[in-house]
């Protein structure tokens, strides 16, 4: 039974349409299988201009995001291991000296004190790491909080005579999670005090339109644009030669809390003049 000319044309057309649809889908499926096997750098790169092309672009964007997250996780683990290795090596070294040497009381105390301080460094690092992990699973409890209460909370956290000047506008009701906000402010203030070169750190709480603006300013060395861009990366330190303590985790915690509050950190800095970090929160009546 021979097909008519029209039927043959229809078969050819249908075959062309089928191949046009199935080939990109097969390519997409093959790429997905290879990616599931760990080849995260692969992309489908199907630019057909139709629904399949749109699906391909969304798929490639998703894989790119996944690849970036995996790279960030790998770098995070490597940085954490590096930061933990330094105090751990010190603890092992000083403990070995105490174990294998005959020392007088002064030297015993000196090495024991160094072990204690390095152990506290590791404890501090672990606490901040746990805090970051908890933040990724935290849902903020938003409630109206008066600016006076926030000011009191800051003063209670820094009641040991830190070089701190708090300028808070009265009567502002801020929609926030009070405990998370204090954690955010504590990390910003501690970071500013660390790099203020002994000068006063200024904290401002003031209304700005329909928002309340929180600002923490120091008069330290300032930051370059590259340092600002990377400031909230875990374990990033702008100047590794400085003796200031810290692991570069504080601003990462701040960024995570700002994300929960649906706001962002803003940096204004000038080299040799200092840095101001600010964020806005919604005001409620």
PLM regions: where:
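Membrane-proximal alpha-helical signal-transduction linkers
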Residues: 20-42, 56, 63
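Membrane-proximal coiled-coil signaling linkers
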Residues: 66-117
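Single conserved hydrophobic/aromatic residue that forms the stacking wall/gate
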Residues: 1-8, 12
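Short helix-loop "hinge" at the ATP-lid/N-box region of the Bergerat-fold HATPase_c
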Residues: 192-193
């Amino acid at each position: 039974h021979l097909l008519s000319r029209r039927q043959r044309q229809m078969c050819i057309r249908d075959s062309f349409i089928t191949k046009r649809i199935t080939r990109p889908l097969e390519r997409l499926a093959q790429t997905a299988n290879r990616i599931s096997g760990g080849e995260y750098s692969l992309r489908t790169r199907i630019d057909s201009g139709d629904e399949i092309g749109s699906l391909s672009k969304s798929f490639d964007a998703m894989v790119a995001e996944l690849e970036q997250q995996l790279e960030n996780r790998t770098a995070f683990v490597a940085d954490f291991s590096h930061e933990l290795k330094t105090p751990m090596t010190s603890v092992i070294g000083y403990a070995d000296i105490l174990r294998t040497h005959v020392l007088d009381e002064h030297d015993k105390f000196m090495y024991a004190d160094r072990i204690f301080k390095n152990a506290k460094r590791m404890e501090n690092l672990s606490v901040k790491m746990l805090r970051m992990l908890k933040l990724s699973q935290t849902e903020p409890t938003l409630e109206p909080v008066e600016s006076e209460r926030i000011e009191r909370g800051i003063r209670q956290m820094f009641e040991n005579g830190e070089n701190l000047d708090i300028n808070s506008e009265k009567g502002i009701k801020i929609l926030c999670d009070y405990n998370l906000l204090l954690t955010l402010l504590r990390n910003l203030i501690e970071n500013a005090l660390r790099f203020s070169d002994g000068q006063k750190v200024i904290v401002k709480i003031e209304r700005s339109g329909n928002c309340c603006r929180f600002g923490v300013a120091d008069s330290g060395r300032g930051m370059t644009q590259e340092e600002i861009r990377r400031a909230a990366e875990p374990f990033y330190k702008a100047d590794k030669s400085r003796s200031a303590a810290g692991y570069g985790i504080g601003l990462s915690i701040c960024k995570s809390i700002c994300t929960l509050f649906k706001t962002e950190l803003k940096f204004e800095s000038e080299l040799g003049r200092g840095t101001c970090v600010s964020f806005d929160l919604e005001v409620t009546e």
